[in-house]
Amino acid sequence: ISGSLGISNMYFWRGQDISNGGAQVFGSLDYSHSSGLYAGVWGSSETDTTEYDLYVGYGGALGDLSYDLSYISYNYPNDTESDLQEVILSLGYAGFSAAGYFGVGDYGHGSDSTDNKDNYFTVGYSYDKYSVLVGTWDRDEDDTNYTHVDLGYALTDNLSFTGSKIVDADDGSEG
């Protein structure tokens, strides 16, 4: 069993600041087994609402190839229409990584939709203290698809910096 506690100047998720520039306090409580099975809860404070996430997964390695399959439920007690769930598959090899986040279950974002078909994909590379990640969100709900590039630098194991830029966006409008 392990835990974490942190503070951030914003809630940075999938290339966007979703906290409207507000500082965040976050923490987790995790259980992991030597077999590769793990589960946990993560939570954050936000000014308008609180979020807690529940997750379970299994990860391991076959030689130099790492793999992970997990399920996560994002929960917003004060805004249940924004709750969503995803199945995540990730692979890594020699500093390279790739992941797919596949929307399942109920979904809201303030709409009447209950069918989450949103998908998010990433490819990345890390070397020493530097990292680059390209993420693409394919949103079914309102066609606000976008691609972002993140550049990161880890000053220490506990302090890192990430810059992100949305490089391609489709706001769903015609024309």
Short names for language-model regions:
Residues 1-175:
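Outer-membrane beta-barrel proteins
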